[in-house]
Amino acid sequence: MVIVIGIDPGVALTGFGLLREAPDGRLEALAHGVIETPKAQPLARRLQLLQQQLQALITTWQPQEAAVEEVFFATNAKTALSVGQARGVVLLTLFNAGIAIHEYTPLQVKQAIAGYGQADKRQMQTMIKALLGLVEPPRPDDAADALAVALTHLHSRRWAQLGA
């Protein structure tokens, strides 16, 4: 059995989703949600809180692999910079925990989950709900994105095993 943590990095909100793949290939959603940092705090403190809360998730769930969404911004340099800083904290925390890290672009995630690179948030949430057998679509969007990136990794993993 393998547990994968999916991460959608951000300073204000970092989405997380944990999936378990059983030896028979069944997938189980273990947990999902967001790590939220208070806007009133200085950036360094917010990044520290992100690291501490991500470390707590790792300690609780003991994932063996991680899937992190690569982020591309073309319009807002300030947002891109802060997300990049959060991504750095996420990657370092995962690396220090000895977790294998895999990265996926938003296009790869949309194609893997919805079969269409231009899928919108609603389409993605509907597919995640169906693929994981959830009662409700995952919310908020950041948590849904994190589940989607974890699911993308598990699909990619299966394809790689078939090709081996």
Region spans (language model):
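Phosphate- and other anionic-substrate recognition elements at nucleic-acid/protein interfaces
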Residues: 1-164
